[in-house]
Every structure is written in C-alpha cells, then in structure tokens.
C-alpha cells in the first residue's frame, strides 16, 4: 500500500512506526536500498528512541528516520528505582522451548542453585512452564511466578534470560542486573548494538561464570550499584522517548 499511496497520491503523508527494541536476529526489519528505491516504504519512519536512528539506516542512508513516542514502554519511562526487592534471581523464559530448557539447565548446574537457594521462573504468556518441563522434574527450589512482568522486574535483583525477548532489555531499565547465558552467538552483540551500559549485564559462557556473576551482583558494592543505575537512567532517555501530546500528534 505504500507503493500505491506514494505513486498515485504523492502529496499524502505516509509514516511508519517501529514500536519495539532491536535485535541482530531481526535484521530483516532494517529497510533496504531496493525498498527505498521502489517506494514500498513510508516516506518517514519513526523509532521509539534516539539510539535506533543510526541503526535503522544500516542498509540505506537515504531513509528519513525520526524519533516518536515509545508507547509500549510508557510505564518504564516513568519508573523510579525501588530499593526493596524480594526476588534475588528470576529466570525469564521465551517462546523458544529449547532455549528456555537450556536456561533452566544452566541454572541447575551452578553452585549457588545447588546450595538450595530459591530461583523464580517467569514463563512466557504463550508458552507455559508445563510445556517446557514437567512439574515433577523441576527441582523444588524452582518457584514459578505469574503476573505483569513490570511488577516482577521492579521486585527483582537479577534477571537471567536469553534469546529474543524485550523483557530482557526492559529488565535493565527496571535496574535489574542481567545475566545472559551464551546460548546464541547473537547474544553478545545485541546489547552492544543498543549501547547498553556494560556495568548492567554479563555474558556467561558456562555455569561457573553464571555462578560468579550471581554472587557478584547479589553482593554488589553500593557505589558500583549507584553508578550502574545512574548510567541506566541516562541511557534510558536515548532508548525510549517520552510520550507527549506533541509527539502523539504524528499519528493524527
């Protein structure tokens, strides 16, 4: 329909809106030179934050990219740090059954878990935990939690996850420390791609590194935590644009 409007109604404003974060696995979301040349794209594409503007032009510098409101992340933008958190470690599972199983397996191999510490699991709404692993096969110190992810993240110290999931990125800006078992080679590039502060996450290539990272963040020095949270807040404004009446008007 972009081709039709731009060919037969060239004076009509056509806009696109990409209201999500980015992953290297989704390179197909970056418009190409051919799409630009043949006018199958909107005249202007809006992203949800300043950090995405250059990324979106990876395959075509001629694109007209602007920043619009981060509608989906409105609550995250207004979030203020909550000191009291009741969950030490939460595993965030996604729609990939194999990846989710590996996240659970990696956790069970850590000394921290073997000592009997509680670990909470938040499964994806479309893939119940029962579809990944039978309840009787789960160690007793795994506890499933349900509810809005934002409320869980606000009460969590460490999030462990992998694969394509906006929840992992959101966790950073709810001031959780994020641990990423290296189950996908793209994992180590996604956060670099978005320029996420290095202090807020660790890539763990084995259970020993995962164990050490858990202990590091649970015993994080106050000064280090303060610096980490400050950097998160500074970067959040580049990742997610505030919703205002002015930027909502782009849709009118």
Task: Enumerate the predicted regions with their spans.
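Structural motif
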Residues: 44, 88, 157-158
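C-terminal alpha-helical cap of glycosyltransferases
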Residues: 222, 236-252
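Active-site and donor-binding regions of nucleotide-sugar-utilizing enzymes
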Residues: 1-71, 166-168
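Short, charged/polar "capping" segments at the starts of alpha-helices
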Residues: 1, 23-26, 52-57, 75-77, ...
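Structural alpha-helical scaffold elements that stabilize or flank donor/cofactor-binding regions
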Residues: 37-38, 151-153
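Catalytic binding pocket for nucleotide-activated donors in carbohydrate/polymer assembly enzymes
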Residues: 42, 59-67, 134-140, 163-238
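Conserved catalytic-core segment of nucleotide-activated headgroup transferases in glycan assembly
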Residues: 66-135
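Acidic donor-binding loop of glycosyltransferase active sites
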Residues: 154-162
């Amino acid at each position: 329909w972009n081709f039709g409007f731009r060919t037969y109604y060239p004076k009509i404003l056509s806009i696109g809106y990409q209201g999500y974060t980015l992953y290297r696995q989704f390179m197909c979301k970056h418009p190409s030179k051919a799409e630009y040349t043949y006018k199958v794209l909107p005249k202007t594409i809006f992203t949800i934050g300043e950090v995405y503007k250059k990324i979106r032009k990876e395959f075509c510098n001629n694109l007209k990219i602007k920043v619009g409101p981060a509608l989906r992340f409105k609550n995250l933008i207004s979030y203020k740090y909550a000191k009291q958190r009741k969950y030490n470690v939460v595993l965030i599972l996604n729609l990939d059954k194999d990846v989710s199983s590996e996240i659970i397996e990696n956790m069970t191999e850590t000394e921290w878990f073997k000592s009997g510490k509680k670990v909470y699991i938040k499964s994806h709404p479309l893939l119940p935990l029962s579809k990944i692993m039978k309840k009787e096969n789960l160690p007793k110190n795994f506890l499933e939690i349900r509810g809005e992810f934002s409320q869980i993240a606000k009460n969590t110290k460490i999030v462990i996850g992998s694969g394509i999931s906006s929840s992992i990125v959101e966790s950073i800006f709810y001031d959780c420390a994020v641990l990423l078992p290296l189950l996908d080679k793209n994992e180590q590039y996604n956060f670099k791609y978005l320029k996420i502060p290095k202090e807020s996450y660790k890539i763990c290539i084995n259970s020993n590194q995962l164990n050490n990272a858990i202990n590091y963040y649970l015993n994080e020095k106050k000064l280090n935590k303060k610096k980490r949270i400050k950097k998160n807040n500074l970067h959040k404004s580049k990742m997610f644009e505030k919703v205002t009446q002015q930027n909502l008007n782009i849709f009118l």
